[in-house]
Amino acid sequence: LAGLPGRYNSYVGIQKEQKDSIDMLVLGDSESMTSISPMELWKSVGITSYICGQSGQRISESYYMLKHALDYQSPQVVLLETNMLSRYTNTPDSLRSSISDTAMYYFPVLQYHNLWKNIVNDQIPEGWQSYKGFAIRPGVAPYSKGSYMKKTKKEKEIPQINLWYLDKIRKLC
Protein backbone atom coordinates (compact mmCIF):
# COMPACT_ATOMS: atom_id res chain seq x y z
CA LEU A 1 0.00 0.00 0.00
CA ALA A 2 1.99 2.91 -1.24
CA GLY A 3 1.10 6.02 0.69
CA LEU A 4 0.90 4.31 4.09
CA PRO A 5 3.71 4.01 6.60
CA GLY A 6 5.17 0.47 6.40
CA ARG A 7 3.76 -1.00 9.62
CA TYR A 8 0.22 -0.05 8.58
CA ASN A 9 0.28 -1.72 5.15
CA SER A 10 -0.84 -5.21 6.13
CA TYR A 11 -3.29 -4.03 8.77
CA VAL A 12 -5.23 -1.86 6.32
CA GLY A 13 -4.48 -3.97 3.23
CA ILE A 14 -5.99 -7.21 4.51
CA GLN A 15 -9.28 -5.50 5.28
CA LYS A 16 -9.36 -4.04 1.74
CA GLU A 17 -9.33 -7.54 0.24
CA GLN A 18 -12.62 -9.14 -0.76
CA LYS A 19 -13.98 -11.01 2.27
CA ASP A 20 -12.88 -14.66 2.46
CA SER A 21 -10.88 -14.42 -0.77
CA ILE A 22 -7.46 -15.37 0.65
CA ASP A 23 -6.35 -19.04 0.82
CA MET A 24 -3.10 -18.45 2.72
CA LEU A 25 -1.94 -15.82 5.21
CA VAL A 26 1.77 -15.32 5.87
CA LEU A 27 3.00 -13.86 9.17
CA GLY A 28 6.53 -12.99 10.23
CA ASP A 29 9.34 -10.50 9.95
CA SER A 30 10.83 -8.91 6.83
CA GLU A 31 11.80 -12.30 5.43
CA SER A 32 8.11 -13.14 5.09
CA MET A 33 7.29 -9.96 3.20
CA THR A 34 10.28 -10.12 0.85
CA SER A 35 10.57 -13.87 0.20
CA ILE A 36 7.04 -14.98 -0.68
CA SER A 37 5.32 -13.35 -3.64
CA PRO A 38 1.52 -13.65 -3.64
CA MET A 39 1.52 -12.76 -7.34
CA GLU A 40 3.93 -15.62 -8.11
CA LEU A 41 1.93 -18.08 -5.96
CA TRP A 42 -1.22 -17.15 -7.87
CA LYS A 43 0.51 -17.36 -11.25
CA SER A 44 2.25 -20.69 -10.63
CA VAL A 45 -0.25 -22.68 -8.52
CA GLY A 46 -3.45 -20.62 -8.25
CA ILE A 47 -3.21 -19.93 -4.50
CA THR A 48 -4.46 -16.57 -3.26
CA SER A 49 -2.30 -15.28 -0.44
CA TYR A 50 -1.60 -12.18 1.59
CA ILE A 51 1.57 -11.26 3.48
CA CYS A 52 0.73 -9.92 6.94
CA GLY A 53 4.37 -9.64 7.95
CA GLN A 54 6.41 -6.55 8.64
CA SER A 55 10.00 -5.65 9.40
CA GLY A 56 11.01 -6.89 12.84
CA GLN A 57 7.54 -8.23 13.58
CA ARG A 58 7.36 -9.68 17.08
CA ILE A 59 5.38 -12.84 17.70
CA SER A 60 2.89 -10.84 19.77
CA GLU A 61 2.34 -8.58 16.73
CA SER A 62 1.88 -11.68 14.57
CA TYR A 63 -0.78 -12.98 16.94
CA TYR A 64 -2.76 -9.74 16.89
CA MET A 65 -2.29 -9.35 13.13
CA LEU A 66 -3.71 -12.85 12.67
CA LYS A 67 -6.66 -12.05 14.95
CA HIS A 68 -7.32 -8.92 12.88
CA ALA A 69 -6.95 -10.75 9.54
CA LEU A 70 -9.36 -13.48 10.65
CA ASP A 71 -12.06 -10.82 10.99
CA TYR A 72 -11.89 -10.50 7.18
CA GLN A 73 -10.53 -13.81 5.89
CA SER A 74 -10.92 -17.57 6.47
CA PRO A 75 -7.65 -18.92 5.09
CA GLN A 76 -6.97 -22.63 4.63
CA VAL A 77 -3.31 -22.14 5.57
CA VAL A 78 -1.42 -19.81 7.91
CA LEU A 79 2.32 -19.77 7.27
CA LEU A 80 4.41 -18.54 10.17
CA GLU A 81 7.97 -17.39 9.46
CA THR A 82 9.85 -18.39 12.59
CA ASN A 83 12.79 -15.96 12.94
CA MET A 84 10.77 -14.09 15.55
CA LEU A 85 10.62 -17.13 17.82
CA SER A 86 14.24 -16.77 18.87
CA ARG A 87 14.10 -12.99 19.18
CA TYR A 88 13.32 -11.06 22.37
CA THR A 89 14.17 -12.63 25.64
CA ASN A 90 12.23 -12.86 28.86
CA THR A 91 13.03 -9.32 29.90
CA PRO A 92 10.96 -6.39 31.14
CA ASP A 93 11.28 -4.82 27.65
CA SER A 94 9.83 -7.95 26.06
CA LEU A 95 6.93 -7.94 28.50
CA ARG A 96 6.38 -4.23 27.88
CA SER A 97 6.25 -4.85 24.10
CA SER A 98 3.75 -7.64 24.60
CA ILE A 99 1.51 -5.43 26.74
CA SER A 100 1.83 -2.63 24.19
CA ASP A 101 0.84 -4.97 21.32
CA THR A 102 -2.19 -6.12 23.32
CA ALA A 103 -3.28 -2.54 24.02
CA MET A 104 -2.86 -1.57 20.38
CA TYR A 105 -5.05 -4.48 19.26
CA TYR A 106 -7.89 -3.64 21.64
CA PHE A 107 -7.48 0.12 21.20
CA PRO A 108 -6.32 0.50 17.57
CA VAL A 109 -6.52 4.27 17.81
CA LEU A 110 -3.25 4.06 19.80
CA GLN A 111 -1.31 2.63 16.87
CA TYR A 112 -3.36 3.66 13.88
CA HIS A 113 -4.37 7.15 14.99
CA ASN A 114 -3.19 8.65 11.70
CA LEU A 115 -5.28 6.20 9.66
CA TRP A 116 -8.60 6.42 11.47
CA LYS A 117 -10.28 8.42 8.69
CA ASN A 118 -9.33 5.83 6.05
CA ILE A 119 -10.41 2.92 8.24
CA VAL A 120 -13.69 4.43 9.47
CA ASN A 121 -14.68 5.80 6.06
CA ASP A 122 -13.42 2.67 4.24
CA GLN A 123 -11.36 4.91 1.95
CA ILE A 124 -8.40 3.74 -0.05
CA PRO A 125 -5.46 6.07 0.55
CA GLU A 126 -4.22 8.13 -2.38
CA GLY A 127 -1.45 6.35 -4.27
CA TRP A 128 -2.62 2.93 -3.07
CA GLN A 129 -0.92 -0.07 -4.66
CA SER A 130 -1.70 -3.63 -3.67
CA TYR A 131 1.03 -6.22 -3.81
CA LYS A 132 -0.85 -8.33 -1.26
CA GLY A 133 1.63 -7.37 1.47
CA PHE A 134 4.68 -8.25 -0.63
CA ALA A 135 7.57 -5.78 -0.52
CA ILE A 136 9.21 -5.36 -3.90
CA ARG A 137 12.95 -4.87 -3.51
CA PRO A 138 14.70 -4.12 -6.79
CA GLY A 139 18.33 -5.05 -6.96
CA VAL A 140 18.10 -8.01 -4.60
CA ALA A 141 20.17 -11.01 -5.66
CA PRO A 142 20.59 -14.45 -4.11
CA TYR A 143 23.66 -15.11 -1.98
CA SER A 144 26.13 -17.20 -3.99
CA LYS A 145 29.36 -17.36 -1.97
CA GLY A 146 28.90 -20.79 -0.41
CA SER A 147 27.56 -21.90 2.91
CA TYR A 148 27.17 -19.22 5.55
CA MET A 149 25.68 -21.40 8.26
CA LYS A 150 27.76 -23.55 10.57
CA LYS A 151 26.51 -26.83 11.94
CA THR A 152 26.54 -26.86 15.70
CA LYS A 153 25.09 -28.86 18.54
CA LYS A 154 24.30 -25.71 20.49
CA GLU A 155 20.67 -25.24 21.33
CA LYS A 156 18.90 -22.05 22.18
CA GLU A 157 15.66 -22.08 24.11
CA ILE A 158 12.69 -20.23 22.74
CA PRO A 159 11.68 -17.55 25.26
CA GLN A 160 8.57 -18.46 27.29
CA ILE A 161 6.58 -15.43 26.14
CA ASN A 162 7.20 -16.45 22.52
CA LEU A 163 6.06 -20.03 23.23
CA TRP A 164 2.94 -18.64 24.88
CA TYR A 165 2.09 -16.56 21.80
CA LEU A 166 2.95 -19.46 19.49
CA ASP A 167 0.38 -21.58 21.35
CA LYS A 168 -2.18 -18.76 21.07
CA ILE A 169 -1.54 -18.64 17.29
CA ARG A 170 -1.95 -22.42 17.09
CA LYS A 171 -5.28 -22.20 18.92
CA LEU A 172 -6.50 -19.42 16.62
CA CYS A 173 -5.68 -21.57 13.62
State where each predicted segment sits.
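N-terminal secretory targeting modules
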Residues: 1-23
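Second-shell loop/turn segments in exported
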Residues: 26, 51-55, 152-160
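Membrane-embedded segments
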Residues: 27, 31-113
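Short, compositionally biased "basic patch" segments
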Residues: 1-6, 35, 138-140
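Alpha-helical scaffolding within the catalytic cores
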Residues: 9-12, 34, 64-67, 164-169
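Conserved phosphate-coordination/catalytic loops
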Residues: 2-6, 60, 156-164
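Hydrophobic helix-cap positions at the C-terminus of alpha-helices
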Residues: 69, 172-173
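Secreted/periplasmic serine-hydrolase-like ester/acetyl group-modifying domain
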Residues: 93-172
